[in-house]
A protein has these predicted regions:
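Charged/polar, solvent-exposed surface patches and flexible loops
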Residues: 25-32, 47, 93, 97-104
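Generic ordered-secondary-structure signal
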Residues: 15, 19-22, 54, 105, ...
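Amphipathic protein-protein interaction modules
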Residues: 39-87
């Protein structure tokens, strides 16, 4: 459910790799919230990272498309959302695109070497 240590690039400031329990909890909440028609409904993903702080953002990697990542803003309702636009998709694309989106949105510069 979480990314393996060998496949872990540097993350932007404020993002962290989850421990196994956190990865499992984030993935389980995502699965509870996903309604039919959502971008991730039926898509195999693994918890890749999460943003620390007041946000409920988690970065999921598509297991069948290793360079596709989706940032989801979880609602933590503990049940299926009724609107297919929720939980909210904040980003969907490559890891490089994720880094660029973080920089654009929050002024967070990509880590060195990326």
């Amino acid at each position: 459910m979480s990314a393996t240590p060998l496949s872990r690039p540097a993350l932007p400031e404020g993002w962290f790799y989850p421990d196994d329990d956190t990865a499992r909890d984030l993935h389980a909440e995502l699965q509870r919230e996903l309604p039919p028609g959502h971008l991730l409904a039926g898509q195999p993903v693994e918890t890749f990272a999460w943003r620390e702080g007041a946000t409920d953002d988690a970065l999921f990697r598509h297991t069948e498309e290793s360079d596709r990542f989706t940032v989801i803003h979880l609602s933590w309702l503990g049940r299926t959302e009724i609107n297919s636009r929720h939980p909210t998709v904040e980003f969907d694309g490559t890891f490089a695109g994720f880094l660029a989106d973080e920089e654009r949105r929050y002024g967070l510069t990509p880590p060195d070497g990326v």
